[in-house]
Amino acid sequence: MYHRLILLALVGTTMANVIPFSMNNIPEEYKEFIPEEVRNFYKDLTVEDKEILRELASKHATFANEDAALEALKDKSDKLYKNAVELRNFVKAKIDSLKPDAKIFVDEIIAKARSLRSDDGHKLDTEKIKQAARDIIAKYQALSEETKEELKVTFPAIAKIIGNEKLKRNASTFLQKN
């Protein structure tokens, strides 16, 4: 169970950097698990900023890579672009600080999370999400204890999630349902 929770936390953190969302959709009791930098980014969004993010998210399949998406964002709002780049650089610095095994693992999670996005803007496929989580859990379990500890230290929000009993129950239930 401990391993599943760590992986879901990493997936959640990654998804926050891959798929724009509104903090209003997150229950209050879970907001404490979101890194402060991410909370601040979303807290400062205007109605117009949110609309720009929704528009670009619906066109994500048209962007060759993250840089192309950021350029499209810059064309829409220089302020929003600067804030997004600042958040991206924060996350990138954390990932770049990791040793090779941990970095490869996080890069794989990001790639997996990006592959879950629907090209046509429809709802995410729950079964694909479950399978992705199972795949990531298997990869996580194969990591050395040193690498697992490094991930916990680098991403402290994970440590908070690990201790939350309600999240543990929800994660277990979600992954077991067919």
Swiss-Prot record:
Matching Gene3D superfamilies: 1.20.120.1100
Pfam family, one: Gp-FAR-1
PANTHER family: FATTY-ACID AND RETINOL-BINDING PROTEIN 1 (PTHR31418:SF7)
Superkingdom of origin: Eukaryota
InterPro entries tied to this protein: Gp-FAR-1
Alphabetized UniProt keyword annotations: Coiled coil, Lipid-binding, Retinol-binding, Secreted, Signal, Vitamin A
Organism: Brugia pahangi
Gene Ontology MF terms in the entry: fatty acid binding; retinal binding; retinol binding
Signal peptide segment: 1-16
Listed name of the protein: Fatty-acid and retinol-binding protein 1
